[in-house]
Amino acid sequence: VFEDGIKRLARVSDRERHVLNLVEELPDNAELPLHVTVASGFPKGDKLEWVAQKTTELGAAAIWAFPADWSVAKWDGKKLAKKAEKLEKIVLGAAKQSKRNRVPEVRLFEKKIDFLDCLSQFDRVIVAYEESAKEGESAALVKAVTELKKGSRILFVFGPEGGLSPAEIATLEEMGAILAGLGPRILRTETAPLYALSAVSVLTELLQ
């Protein structure tokens, strides 16, 4: 795993001083064509740790979390710092195991407004909305992903247990987010991000 996302072949020239000589850059690329960030409302227990590990394996570029209206978990600054440190270790291990070129960014927001202020940096924001799934909506996700060019930045927003509140949905829509169902079944807060990333992989890698 390298900071710039490029894998390289090197030869050890000095073991004591840990000096390497670059032999060549390798074309191997294990990253998704889209820069995908997953953002979850603070879930209960250790669900975020599980989400961080599995979404890293599936190609997420960043794992974010924020205090949603219906989040049961309440984390202050000190708890957030400790949680972030734990998550960073988890994603590093998962990135190595899955032979990623990059280690995903971990960012936990203490205030929801700070999270919302970051939405403008994305080319597309998709909100996983269970009401869309109940209504049988199935095209929004496919359309939103396939319209994007390679390298585009996409943000998926997921609610905690109980989902996002009507006020949050309204705010996200006002900010230009797209509401999308994730298939005909209602998914748990820790399962939905995996579905979304798998869909991105199928649409941008396997079907190309």
Label every PLM stretch briefly.
Residues 43, 47, 161-165, 185:
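Gly/Ser/Thr-rich beta-alpha loop segments that engage phosphate groups in nucleotides
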Residues 125-163, 167-169, 177-181:
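Active-site/ligand-binding-proximal alpha/beta "capping" segment
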Residues 26, 132-133, 184-187:
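Short, acidic/turn-prone active-site loops that include or flank metal/cofactor-
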Residues 7-15:
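Short beta-strand-centered aromatic/proline hotspots
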Residues 165-208:
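Structured adenosyl-cofactor binding patch, chiefly the S-adenosyl-L-methionine
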Residues 72-73, 135, 189, 196:
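Generic structural signal for helix capping and beta-alpha/helix-loop junctions
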Residues 14, 23-127:
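RNA substrate-binding interface of SAM-dependent RNA methyltransferases
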Residues 1-4:
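Short conserved beta-strand and strand-loop elements enriched in small hydrophobics
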